[in-house]
């Protein structure tokens, strides 16, 4: 299969998903594509341009706020989608807002989010505040989730039983034992914590829609 910019960028995303972005080099990427390193510069001028294109692919995967529903539902769906996408591409968490040459999907995404908030009645500056606040929750949670030593509620339950509780004598840490038992009994997992925080943020923003 011949090279194209799309193939180069998709392969770069695949490598970053498996190996992280720090070790991604044009030489490593060329090897994965079975091509010479210099041939890649026909499609991307340098690593920064490659990262711009990779981030654009990530933004393409995030659902835009739908226009056929209320602003809270629309921003909720978009935030949940963003968290799911960043769980697939954790290397992108620190890069999403760092690009000085954003691609078309990146720009479309930010335009759609801003439009959703403005059409809902948020004044210009308040729409910016709302956008930053929601994104801070999404990116902060994604970063925290990427560092957790478990992925699912079942894995958390096993870790609590086998790893955490043996380190927590009940007479010394009664409240941590209480919390751990409640979480395991509830089948609690990382996504529930994100939804809890997201719904609080959206509810808190609602009264600010008509503020000057």
Segments (PLM) and residue ranges:
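Actinobacteria-biased recognition of intrinsically disordered, low-complexity terminal regions
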Residues: 1-6, 210-212
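Helix-turn-helix
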Residues: 7, 11-49, 53
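Amphipathic alpha-helical interaction segments
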Residues: 7, 49, 77, 108, ...
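Short, basic, alpha-helical segments at the C-terminal edge of helix-turn-helix-like DNA-binding modules
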Residues: 57-61
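Hydrophobic alpha-helical connector segments
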Residues: 63-108, 124-127, 131-134
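A contiguous pocket-lining binding segment that forms or flanks enzyme active sites
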Residues: 112-165
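C-terminal peripheral helix-coil segments that are non-catalytic and often amphipathic
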Residues: 119, 147-212
């Amino acid at each position: 299969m011949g090279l194209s910019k799309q193939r180069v960028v998709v392969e770069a995303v695949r490598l970053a998903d498996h190996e992280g972005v720090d070790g991604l080099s044009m030489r490593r990427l060329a090897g994965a594509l079975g091509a010479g390193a210099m041939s890649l510069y026909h499609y991307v001028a340098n690593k920064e341009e490659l990262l711009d294109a990779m981030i654009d692919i990530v933004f393409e995967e995030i659902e835009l706020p739908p226009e056929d529903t209320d602003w809270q539902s629309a921003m909720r769906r978009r935030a949940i989608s963003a968290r799911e996408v960043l769980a697939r591409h954790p290397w992108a968490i620190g890069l999403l807002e760092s690009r000085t040459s954003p691609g078309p999907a990146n720009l479309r995404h930010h335009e759609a989010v801003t439009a959703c908030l403005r059409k809902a009645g948020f004044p210009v500056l308040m729409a910016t505040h709302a956008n930053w606040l929601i994104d801070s929750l999404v990116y902060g949670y994604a970063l925290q989730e990427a560092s957790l030593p478990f992925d699912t509620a079942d894995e958390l339950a096993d870790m609590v039983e086998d790893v955490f509780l043996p380190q927590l004598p009940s007479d010394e840490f009664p409240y941590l034992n209480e919390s751990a038992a409640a979480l395991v009994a509830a089948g609690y997992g990382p996504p529930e914590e994100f939804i809890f925080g997201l719904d609080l943020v959206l509810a808190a923003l609602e009264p600010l829609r008509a503020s000057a």
